Amino acid sequence: MKEDSCLQIGGKSFSSRLMVGTGKYTSSEVMLESLANTESEIVTVAVRRIQNNQNGENLLEKIDWKKFWMLPNTAGCTNSDEAIRIAILGRELAKLSGQEENNFVKLEVIPDKKYLLPDPIETLKAAEILINKDFIVLPYINADPILAKKLEEIGCSTVMPLGSPIGSGQGLLNLSNISIIIENSNIPVIIDAGIGVPSEASQAMELGADGVLINSAIALAKNPLKMAKAMNYGVKAGREAFLAGRIEKQKLANASSPEINISIK
């Protein structure tokens, strides 16, 4: 059995392996209760949402940033230049919220408006520049093992391959590539986007992912508070299963009660 440890990102330790987003909730009250139910420690915030004042200031004031670590994201950026500018704004927001040492950024560069698929070239370009500016970069990418390795090599602190398109709830569509990324990676692998139900979160963790990031599946559930708890349980169960080690698959049946040294009189 493997030994468990805390999730380590950029020199910080986190007990929870479930990261959560703050968008799409029906109210800030539902969001806050859902965040509490997930027991998450890392919360993503869309910097552009705050910049455009779409309830952004209210969001910053509502969340207790002594309890949660802010992960500013560059959602809405379509090229590397935009992403770099928004990342710098995000770092300032974290400082204004009391997290002076927070250099984290979830890097998203998405020019594709229909499927919201990330641009690998612009992501790699932005990541390299942000790392040189002392950011802890968590890049959102397609499930591309080669890109994931290149991002690791230039100094990214995690890679965040998508399970399926953002908000689609389609689950993990490319298990093979995700497994390769996990196998080859020396940094945490966080599955981001597409998870719809706790069993899919558990599946990601069973594969050996270091964590998952979930937003839509909780916020858009019929009962977000219950789904938040369920996702928490799913991530924990999947992690325990990974550490325990699954039974080997076999072509033939193997009786659980073998008839060995049993005498019948």
UniProtKB/Swiss-Prot annotation:
Pfam families noted in UniProt: ThiG
Domain of life (superkingdom): Bacteria
Subcellular location: Cytoplasm
Pathway: Cofactor biosynthesis; thiamine diphosphate biosynthesis
Keyword Methyltransferase: no
Signal peptide from the UniProt entry: none
Top enzyme class: transferase
Stretches that traverse the bilayer: none
Keyword entries, A-Z: Cytoplasm, Schiff base, Thiamine biosynthesis, Transferase
Residues bound to 1-deoxy-D-xylulose 5-phosphate: G167, A193, G194, N215, S216
Example GO BP: thiamine diphosphate biosynthetic process
Active site: K106
EC identifiers of the protein: 2.8.1.10
The keyword Phosphoprotein is annotated on this UniProt entry: no
Main location: cytoplasm
Catalyses which reaction(s): [ThiS sulfur-carrier protein]-C-terminal-Gly-aminoethanethioate + 2-iminoacetate + 1-deoxy-D-xylulose 5-phosphate = [ThiS sulfur-carrier protein]-C-terminal Gly-Gly + 2-[(2R,5Z)-2-carboxy-4-methylthiazol-5(2H)-ylidene]ethyl phosphate + 2 H2O + H(+)
UniProt GO molecular function: thiazole synthase activity
Gene Ontology CC terms, in alphabetical order: cytoplasm
Entry similarity comment: Belongs to the ThiG family.
Record's function text: Catalyzes the rearrangement of 1-deoxy-D-xylulose 5-phosphate (DXP) to produce the thiazole phosphate moiety of thiamine. Sulfur is provided by the thiocarboxylate moiety of the carrier protein ThiS. In vitro, sulfur can be provided by H(2)S.
Subunit description: Homotetramer. Forms heterodimers with either ThiH or ThiS.
Protein name (record): Thiazole synthase
The gene coding this protein: thiG
